[in-house]
């Protein structure tokens, strides 16, 4: 067995601290750089003050670990703060220098930036570390929890500087993002002030986190990383179970396409893919049955009725859409919503003359798979198997390795010479997870998942949630989103949950800005 060096996830950034030369005042808003922008909203001129600053004392990626604070002239001390994340694929986290562009005219109804400026909201964006970062001195510092830690540090920066900010209420922070950004937004909203993140926050010099004499970490009052609410789209969350969830939902669809020859992955042996699919689907059954989630009537959600629960959520969105745009337009949507020419309704949604309808989830899944080719199996953790460009494995692992499989199947079947997996450690997934290194990996996985923190319930969970996932979006399993919706709706700390599927939306976000920001305005 090859000997490998493994370290705790909580010390991923420790090595860079000794070389940091930034001083305490680097996270003081008073030292930020200011630029005056002139934009317009619906043709009306508006001045915006743009501030740029460091948000941590010890950055190891200083070109990205920067924060933008945009304050329109109509903002006040009571204005909410819209906190924008990027994080596409857990990769696209570089510092954005054009969240608000000088001279641009914004739409004050359908553009989220335009709405924020029109209403006098403070807009914040930032850059952070990601799994795509090059190693620093041979160490991979972009693994989990780096992205979450940096995001929390940026939020802490705002609270640390509450008295210096010209406008904006730091207790009214709403975080928003799409896809990986949706996942990041939801996990931040679910894990407010969780001690899980204190060590990594301390190591980068985030505001308000101290190391006590007894070796424990603490957070100062008034410098927390909790948020008031979240607007999230298609969150790629619960990664530890996402591969299994994908095959549990799409396994039968995949088998039909395999038999009919409609499934084509030129770089994968289809027999290997189908074997992986079956094994992963079985794992998800065990996971679902262990959660103890309940529906609105108090009935336990299990592997035998979860599809019925998903279908019920789809019915809710179909009913809403019927009342909003009507049956005729919906039928047109079904046939025109295609990337490969005209699509034919395969009977997944059929309306009767009197206006009633029948919905078939299995046919709906096939319809979705015709729209966009299904991800391979495993869908998210497969770098050590047969796919090198469609996975999230580089989000995990110690700083000594470029990536790590993050579920049982991918670990046990890893084939690459990479220092991880059963082939290199000699340990099965279950055996490895009993080790100190395995527990560190489990914590890394947890720190990317809103569901884990919602079910645990010990953090300062955001009280307001607006989350959507498109009915034509196959980038993660409908099961993952259904469980997320359920965990949000049944959490006692959540005051308002506006969650659900979105009529025939693909993998995308911010398609319902008027609705989402109307919801936000009612809360405020």
Predicted segments, located by residue:
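Primarily recognizes the serine-hydrolase "nucleophile elbow" in alpha/beta-hydrolase
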Residues: 160-252, 445
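Short beta-strand element of the alpha/beta-hydrolase
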Residues: 67, 78-90
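Hydrophobic h-region of N-terminal signal peptides that target proteins for export
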Residues: 10-18
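Non-catalytic, alpha-helical, charged scaffold/linker segments
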Residues: 216, 232-237, 241-382
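Cap/lid segment of the alpha/beta-hydrolase catalytic domain
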Residues: 85-148, 191, 505-506
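C-terminal subdomain of alpha/beta-hydrolase-fold enzymes, centered on the catalytic histidine
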Residues: 326-524
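Alpha/beta-hydrolase active-site loop
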Residues: 141-164
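N-terminal cap/lid segment of alpha/beta-hydrolase-fold proteins
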Residues: 21-77, 436-447, 456
